[in-house]
Amino acid sequence: MATEYRTASWKLWLILDPRRVLTALFVYLTVIALLIHFGLLSTDRLNWWEFQRGLPKAASLVVVPPAVG
């Protein structure tokens, strides 16, 4: 049965246009990716843009070595 499926699967592309299938797949995956990203941005916990505003500046984390005199 598995051998019959592998040998006959090429017939699907005689019915479906590969260019249309790949274009539709690209559009579908792009829409899904945008929905997921905007969904994450709309939450308080997983919003990576708003999260960075509350963090201290990186300059305050710099350690200055003591002067050796």
Swiss-Prot record:
Cytoplasmic face of the membrane: 2-20
Periplasmic topology ranges: 42-59
Keywords associated with the record: Antenna complex, Bacteriochlorophyll, Cell inner membrane, Cell membrane, Chlorophyll, Chromophore, Light-harvesting polypeptide, Magnesium, Membrane, Metal-binding, Transmembrane, Transmembrane helix
InterPro entries associated with the record: Antenna_a/b, Antenna_alpha, Antenna_alpha_CS, Light-harvesting_complex
Propeptide, chain numbering: 60-69
PROSITE patterns: ANTENNA_COMP_ALPHA
TM ranges: 21-41
Subcellular localization, as worded in the UniProt entry: Cell inner membrane
GO MF annotation: an example: bacteriochlorophyll binding
Superkingdom, natural source: Bacteria
Main location per the UniProt record: membrane
Function: Antenna complexes are light-harvesting systems, which transfer the excitation energy to the reaction centers.
Subunit structure of this chain's protein: The core complex is formed by different alpha and beta chains, binding bacteriochlorophyll molecules, and arranged most probably in tetrameric structures disposed around the reaction center. The non-pigmented gamma chains may constitute additional components.
Family: Belongs to the antenna complex alpha subunit family.
Record's protein name: Light-harvesting protein B-1015 alpha chain
Gene: pufA
